[in-house]
Amino acid sequence: MTESGSTASPLCGVGSSVMTETQETYQATTRVKRGLADMLKGGVIMDVVTPEQARIAEDAGASAVMALERVPADIRSQGGVARMSDPDLIEGIVNAVSIPVMAKARIGHFVEAQVLEALGVDFIDESEVLSPADYTHHINKWKFDVPFVCGATNLGEALRRITEGAAMIRSKGEAGTGDVSEAVRHLRTIRGDINRLRSLDEDELFVAAKEFQAPYDLVREVASTGKLPVVTFVAGGVATPADAALVRQMGAEGVFVGSGIFKSGNPAARAAAIVKAATLFDDPSVIADVSRGLGEAMVGINVSDVPAPHRLAERGW
C-alpha cells in the first residue's frame, strides 16, 4: 500500500445513472464499514493501557476498547511527541478481550494506519490526541479495509472526514481534561449546522457545500435526512455517569471515555456506572442510583485553563 495513486471517493458520480464496478465496490465497502460502526451505537468505548484494564472495561459492559500507551490526561501532563502505541501492547489487548479493539494513528500518518490494520484492530482512530504527522492532509481512509473513527468540532470537519472515508464521527471535546463542556459545544455546533442546512433551498446548498468544503451530494443528503450518514459519538471530558447521560440526551449515539475511568478512585464501578447511564440516559432516578459511592472522579482541569497552543481539539482541518 502506498500513499501515491488516485483513489476516487464513492461520493463521486452519485447522481449518474451509470455506476462503474469500482464505485459499486466502494459503495459495498462503505455499507460494511458503516454497518460495523452502527453496531456500537448506544455503547461506551473506553481507553485502556493494559490487558487488565481491557478486561475490566469488557466486564463493565463496554462496547469496545481503545488500546493506547498513555491515556490523554497523561499525554497532556507528560508532553512530548505522542505516537501510535507499541504493537506488542495492542496485540496484548486484542488477545485479552472479545469485544472490538480500536487503536489510534496520528493525523495524516498513513503508515501507522497500515501497521494497525496489519495488527488486526477492528477500528482505527485518526486522532488529534496524538501529535499530527501531516499538517496538510488527513489519511485517505478509502484505501483501507478497516473502518476509521475521526473527530470533528463542526459540521464542515465532519463532512470532510466522511468524504475521506470515515465510518464514525466523534466530537473532539478536549481530551484528558475531565471537562465535558467542549464536547457539549462541539455536539451543539454540529447539530446547529445541520439544522441550518435543513432551512436552505437547493441554490443555497451549493453555497453551503463551498463553505463546508464538502461535496454537494453529501451536503444535500445531510440536509434531507437531518443527520450525518455515519454514527456520531461524543468524546472528550466525559468523566461521570451524568456526563454520559447528558450527551446521550443531547443526541449522541454513543460515548468515548478516555481518562475518566482509570484516573478515578474506583475504575470498575465507574466504568459499569457510565455504561448503565449511557444506556438508560433518560431516567434520572437510574443516573442518581449509579452515581452513588463511585469514589473520587478524576481531578481534571478546566478547559478555560488550558492555553490555546495546548488545546488538542484544534488539531485537524
From Swiss-Prot:
It comes from Corynebacterium glutamicum (strain ATCC 13032 / DSM 20300 / JCM 1318 / BCRC 11384 / CCUG 27702 / LMG 3730 / NBRC 12168 / NCIMB 10025 / NRRL B-2784 / 534). Its EC number is 4.3.3.6. PANTHER family: PYRIDOXAL 5'-PHOSPHATE SYNTHASE SUBUNIT SNZ1-RELATED. This is Pyridoxal 5'-phosphate synthase subunit PdxS. Keywords: Lyase, Pyridoxal phosphate, Schiff base. The gene is pdxS. GO terms for molecular function: pyridoxal 5'-phosphate synthase (glutamine hydrolysing) activity. NCBIfam families: PRK04180.1 (NF003215), pyridoxal 5'-phosphate synthase lyase subunit PdxS (TIGR00343). Pathway: Cofactor biosynthesis; pyridoxal 5'-phosphate biosynthesis.
